[in-house]
């Protein structure tokens, strides 16, 4: 990739557009679900409520990682020893929360993520070897994985 400011800005816009497209797919697929899907397991043991809570938790974890980077602290996001256990713990924590509140958490966590991304330079966000790029890519891929699960219900 040519590292001129114009191409870096273009690549940043492309990545942020991809992020937006994947999250819009999440929302679109949530909207197509029936009320009964909120608490009915259809993705393994997970219901729509569980997936929405999980996505909000994941966004919040990535926001924390971006803050850690910005503040010079080590990032532990990629070092979670038992990802299945982490996911199960976070899903369980959200199970008692009203579904509509979880949707608001999902909106809020994405807004916080976008704020953090605004603070990242084009160079870091578009460098495929940077932690910032890897974090952004993980969110894009994560949204894609889960909207596919919702769509397949």
PLM features: residue spans?
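Alpha-helix C-capping/helix-to-loop hinge sites
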Residues: 36, 93-97, 120
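Short amphipathic alpha-helical segments with heptad-repeat character
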Residues: 13-16, 20, 52, 56, ...
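Short, helix-capping/interhelical loops that line the mouth of catalytic, cofactor-
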Residues: 1-14, 62-108
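Structural signal for well-ordered, non-membrane alpha-helices
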Residues: 23-34, 60-67, 107-121, 144-147
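Long, hydrophobic N-terminal alpha-helical segment
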Residues: 8, 12-37
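Short, contiguous alpha-helical
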Residues: 2-3, 36-85, 122-153
